[in-house]
Design a protein with these regions (language model features):
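N-terminal pre-catalytic "stem/leader" segment of glycosyltransferase-like enzymes
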Residues: 1-74, 228
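Short hydrophobic beta-strand element within catalytic cores of glycosyltransferases
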Residues: 312-315
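Donor nucleotide-sugar binding/catalytic pocket of nucleotide-sugar-dependent glycosyltransferases
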Residues: 118-177
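Conserved catalytic-core segment of nucleotide-activated headgroup transferases in glycan assembly
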Residues: 20-22, 27, 164-280
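Extended catalytic core of nucleotide-activated donor transferases of GT-like folds
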Residues: 6-8, 45-129
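Aromatic "clamp/platform" in nucleotide-sugar-dependent glycosyltransferases that forms part
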Residues: 293-295
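Short glycine/serine-rich donor-binding loops of glycosyltransferases
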Residues: 300-303, 318
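Short acidic alpha-helix that forms the nucleotide-activated donor recognition element
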Residues: 274-288, 308
């Protein structure tokens, strides 16, 4: 009888953590050493339904626990989430996290990692931040130090990687509606940004989408020859009409802050795309480079995906993505 290995993760979501979860679970299933069961979790407001929409992942369905019920204490328990949510449910417990996008983490994250037997992060940046984190907890009445908080459990880096059967340089370009819509723009040179548009005003959101748009307008305003910028993004983490209108509204708000009527074009790619469609976007001849002004990434999966089509990546030189860029 194989050891029971239960993995709690956002397996069915359209998210970076969802992609990480699917890759991880697939790899463990292929070891054929464990009885793998999946406990699906949500990931913020990101939409569900990835497995249903992508038949090549349907094999995961037979591993999903019915009604979310854990049959017994597993020999191995793993969670793919942020560390403050880690709980030791199994006889041996593993926490998987992309980690941290800054230089300092919350002490509750260290507490969560200390509850596990092993912690696995996506980048050297994340590992270093956790190893260097040290805090003092004080009594609020006496101001006396009641405990020192530091990482006491092992932490290792497991590189996320990409599926080279999907993300690759295409020998033959597709002929479909998506390809034709990108082809229809008048510009011959376009940048691409791919990622969520997180909370905050211009310069405040972590992935810096607002500042990217502002900088793009300011850099190429009044130029005779202007490139385009494609944004594959969402704000409410969905593919709804409401979300699309919210993205368009924010772009227009930023556009109004630029002192010119002669501005470059920004095009929005909105909705749910398959991995194959994303790779087709990467390979489109009008897409010349990926750009991201991100303030920090635990890993930065789209940046790695894009490198496989042999085009330049323009981004900040700090945090998780410098492991591979």
């Amino acid at each position: 009888m194989k050891p029971l290995f239960i993995i709690s993760c956002p397996i069915d979501t359209y998210s970076g953590y969802g992609s990480r979860s699917r890759d991880l679970v697939k790899a463990i299933i292929e070891l054929d050493k464990y009885d793998i069961k999946i406990l699906p979790q949500r990931w913020g407001g990101t939409p569900w339904g990835f497995i249903q929409d992508n038949p090549e992942w349907k094999f995961l369905e037979k591993h999903i626990l019915p009604n979310g019920q854990i049959p017994r204490q597993p020999e191995i328990w793993a969670q793919v989430t942020i560390p403050n949510e880690f709980q030791p449910v199994g006889k041996y417990n593993i926490g998987f996290t992309a980690g941290i996008e800054t230089t300092v983490c919350n002490p509750t994250w260290i507490d969560g990692m200390n509850r596990m037997n092993l912690n696995i992060v996506s980048s050297k940046h994340s590992k270093d931040v956790f190893l260097n984190a040290k805090f003092e907890e004080k009594n609020q009445q006496t101001n006396q130090i009641v405990r020192h908080i530091k990482l006491e459990k092992p932490v290792e880096v497991l590189f996320e990687g990409v599926d080279l059967n999907i993300y690759k340089l295409l020998d033959k370009l597709p002929q479909n509606e998506l390809f034709d819509s990108i082809n229809s723009i008048p510009e011959s040179f376009a940048y691409l940004y791919l990622g969520h548009w997180l909370q905050g005003d211009i310069g405040e959101d972590r992935k810096n989408v607002g500042l990217l748009i502002k900088a793009f307008y300011e850099t190429f305003k009044n130029k005779k020859q202007k490139p385009a910028l494609f944004l594959k993004t969402s704000i409410l983490a969905g593919a709804s009409y409401v979300d699309r209108e919210e993205v368009i509204k924010k772009i227009k708000q930023i556009k109004k802050t630029v002192n010119s009527k002669d501005l470059p074009n920004i095009y929005l790619l909105h909705g749910e795309f398959s991995d194959i469609e994303i790779n087709e976007i990467y390979n489109h001849p009008k897409i010349k480079a990926m750009i991201s002004l991100t303030k920090g990434e635990g890993f930065g999966r789209p940046l790695l995906e894009f490198t496989q089509c042999k085009k330049p990546v323009i981004t900040t030189g700090w945090s998780g993505h410098v492991d591979f860029l």
